[in-house]
């Protein structure tokens, strides 16, 4: 039986989830891209080529890569699983009453691979093989979406995240992204690779979590039973404490959760946009933000469900991490260049690298200063083109959801 679990940020990566660019990105226009959380439209064919190159580099190192469209198509082959997804995706609240029956009948009979493409890529009114009835159907223009696309599925780090031997199914901050969690939940629940083998710590699409929001770019299981969770633009303290209660001192969970309070800005939307592990004792950081982070540690209390808090007033994140990992020293590589270049490279995901192993990372090619500094510190930097993939504001760390990763012995 496969043992899923992520035990560090930089140990050997063995299995990872990704989502290639596709139909959802062909739907992006200058008019709608900001609503869909992209800064610009992208050249989809080039983005697909660049994403495939990243996947090729991972597979060349023996990493098992699971692709969302393919996994979802496999799930949709099962009638019960298809019904489970469509019951939650195609509802009167989403598509109105008038077209509900006709739309559901059409999707029930659609080939699995085509349906997977549309569940991620959306459906426009002009694609319907029937004349949509009802007020909503008449309200829509020809190119309006019946089911909106979810192009941020490219960034698989966020809708679910593994914390040691369990996973959270994340209630995401922006409405444009909330359907991503449904896709991941269906894969973990019904795909034969995962079904019956996944320990879910918290979350799921059947509960309205209100302001308790969590995104995986803020979550880092760093080893020694410690997990960092950023609290900035996307992840709320209401969610962090609930997750802490579920993982602390549970079998396969964590012994310490460190909440990292960040400024709320799009440039630093997640912890992994300003802070990443290159090795257990080597970090890439954007100091302008990281030095302002305030940390609070959470531990299991004496009674069931009780949490003990320890606020680290005046102690920098890097020092909190060093102590939590029982390290004598942590070396820090700051985002490279002068003040202007440093800010540009952080914006272009210079710190958002994903480790394939200790001191082996995937990074965007455009961050030349930061990449050079990493190489000078003995890190192998595998560069991938940034011109198209980076338009959604996410790098290698954002585009990957580790499912099996080794621990690093301290």
UniProtKB/Swiss-Prot annotation:
One of its GO terms (cellular component) is cytoplasm. Pathway: Amino-acid degradation; L-arginine degradation via ADI pathway; carbamoyl phosphate from L-arginine: step 1/2. Keywords: Arginine metabolism, Cytoplasm, Hydrolase. Transmembrane segments: none annotated. Its main location: cytoplasm. It is an enzyme of class 3 (hydrolase). It catalyses: L-arginine + H2O = L-citrulline + NH4(+). One of its GO terms (molecular function) is arginine deiminase activity. It comes from the Bacteria. Pfam families: ADI. It is found in: Cytoplasm. The active site is at 398 (amidino-cysteine intermediate). Its EC number is 3.5.3.6. GO terms for biological process: arginine catabolic process to ornithine; arginine deiminase pathway. InterPro entries: Arg_deiminase (IPR003876). Belongs to the arginine deiminase family. This is Arginine deiminase. The lineage of its organism: Bacteria, Pseudomonadati, Pseudomonadota, Betaproteobacteria, Neisseriales.
